[in-house]
Amino acid sequence: IDSMLKDPVKIAKSCNSSYHPHIPLPRNLFGKERLNSKGLDLKDPVTLAKLSLEMEQSISETIIVEPLIYTDKQKLNELKKITVTNPADRSEVIGYYHEVDAEAVAIAIDSAYQCREAWANVDVADRANMLHEVADKLEAATPLFMNLAIKEAGKLWQDAVDEVREAVDFLRYYAVRAVEDLGVTTLPGPTGELNQLEYHGRGVVFCISPWNFPLAIFCGQIAAALVAGNTVLAKPSSQTVLTATKFVELLYDAGVPQNVMQLIPGSTDVAGEKVVADTRVDAVMLTGSNATAKAIYMKLAARDGAIVPLIAETGGMNTMIVDSTALTEQVVQDIVDSAFQSAGQRCSALRVVFIQDEVADKTITMLQGAMMELVVGDPALLQTD
């Protein structure tokens, strides 16, 4: 009886166990290249209790965002003020932000254009170090950004964890790749001369990001553009400006100059079309709809001069093909995860399933049962799917 009453956790901790030396810990998954982002086990009561408290304390008051382009309070009062509410509870006000006007957009473009050469001449290692510092700061601020992901973007707890981790991974990945790929390379000289190859930033890059990944995609676009030596104008989704602003503040804290990285929240006609049409903008990065990508493409094509690169990640018709060799339980779990995580609002979400006739009825019946078990509700509640 005494042995049965012993605490199994204490017994496990007392064992002289050791991990296999050739199996890296999750943190060291990428070896010497870079650190992996820190995961959180939401099924662990201790971790969950600590995280819940930190999240509760991360937003102590209403967040108010003011464009850094203007310092004149009188001018700020003339801008349109937008109220940000919790999508699960519209009575809960999270914060406020001001939309930029045409004058602010013009100032931002001019500022980014004027400092493009100075930023491009900053050593790539220094730019990469800034991204590493931002990654560390972002990881330390996980409770804040999880809180924003849930309250501003309506994400579930696990999705919020994944959102922060993906952003951290983007920062470290691009920092490492930039140092390895964008530094000075000495080429062979057939006659003994010194030939060197060095990549140079294009200039001003306009980044347009969506609401469904308000931190990860927003961060990834900006990180890639900045570390490559470009100045950035970033237009976040109007639904997730607070998240974008808090991330930009981390960039500034890490040493990125304010005129190198500028946030321009606003309407499409003011903060979108005017920037795309400006000939001083050298490239556009978009994650959004096919229609938006086509509209930007046509706008860029109408401009005089050299071809302007458009890097666009848009939607698609994602499919799954299931034959009789597949384990039905696993198929159903994969369908539910791919089709319904984030309420299906992902460019990678499953749209169509093709099932072999012989297993179709069984699979569909089990899928219907799994869907009936899904809980729709407040994303702040752990039981919500």
Model-identified regions with their sequence ranges:
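A structured beta-alpha segment of the ubiquitous adenosine-cofactor-binding alpha/beta core
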Residues: 194-196, 262-285
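Extended hydrophobic-aromatic, low-complexity segments
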Residues: 92-96, 105-108, 121-128, 146-148, ...
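Extended, amphipathic, non-transmembrane alpha-helical segments
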Residues: 139-145, 367
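Conserved small-residue-rich beta-alpha loop and adjacent elements
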Residues: 184-258, 315, 329
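ALDH superfamily catalytic-core signature
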Residues: 8, 250-255, 277, 283, ...
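Residue-level signal for inorganic ion chemistry
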Residues: 91, 112, 127, 149, ...
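Generic beta-strand/beta-sheet core signal
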Residues: 85-87, 148-152, 163, 174, ...
